[in-house]
Amino acid sequence: MLCLPVFIILLLLASPAAPNPLERRIQSDLIRTALEDADMKTPKGVLSGIMSNLGTVGNMVGGFCCTVYSGCCSEK
């Protein structure tokens, strides 16, 4: 008898809440405006540059990224 209410509560806790469309649109507008204000342009190979600053582990991750997706490689 106690299993059904407990199951329903666990199901409600585990299910993701649906995002509010208005809130999501406002958030994406704010992010877009902030990027335009800062005039941020991502240079090619930015992930590879960040990973190279991390040392040996960064070089391994950067090399793996280049084999999987060439967009994260820096041009040489």
Curated annotation (Swiss-Prot):
A molecular-function term among this protein's GO annotations: ion channel inhibitor activity
Positions of transmembrane segments: none
Residue ranges of coiled coil: none
Keyword Disulfide bond carried by entry: yes
One Pfam family hit: Conotoxin
Compartments it resides in: Secreted
Changes after translation: Contains 2 disulfide bonds that can be either 'C1-C3, C2-C4' or 'C1-C4, C2-C3', since these disulfide connectivities have been observed for conotoxins with cysteine framework V (for examples, see AC P0DQQ7 and AC P81755).
Endpoints of the signal sequence: 1-19
Tissue distribution of the protein: Expressed by the venom duct.
Residues making up the propeptide: 20-44
InterPro entries listed in its UniProt record: Conotoxin
Protein keywords: Disulfide bond, Neurotoxin, Secreted, Signal, Toxin
Gene Ontology CC: extracellular region
Record remark: domains: The cysteine framework is V (CC-CC).
Family listed: Belongs to the conotoxin T superfamily.
Protein's UniProt name: Conotoxin TsMLCL-03
Native species: Conus tessulatus (Tessellate cone)
